[in-house]
Amino acid sequence: MNTIQVAGVETTPSKIVCVGRNYVAHIEELGNEVPEQMVVFGKPNSAIGNKLQAFHGGEPLHYEGEIALAISNGRATAAGFGLDLTKRTLQGQLKKKGLPWERAKAFDLSLIHI
């Protein structure tokens, strides 16, 4: 299992919960509609990494800076910064078919912590 440092303590996140489509300028840039409710998706522990890669499985990756919170017992215990990596071409193909786009967001090393 991958770990992160939270307040100097090595921690193994049990799950990673992400909120998508929360930045209007980026929503418009991608030609998406602003959702009425927040879009939530998950990433597995294997998504955590610390080396930025430009490609995954031959596909170029897009990145977005994200504010990250560590939550324990219902409380935010730390804040940090990370990069959310996306297989944008695959995501577009899945969205056109009305399929979940988890494969484009939740692959190994798709969440870079800094």
Feature names for model-found ranges:
Residues 1-113:
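Catalytic-core "active-site belt" of small-molecule-metabolizing enzymes
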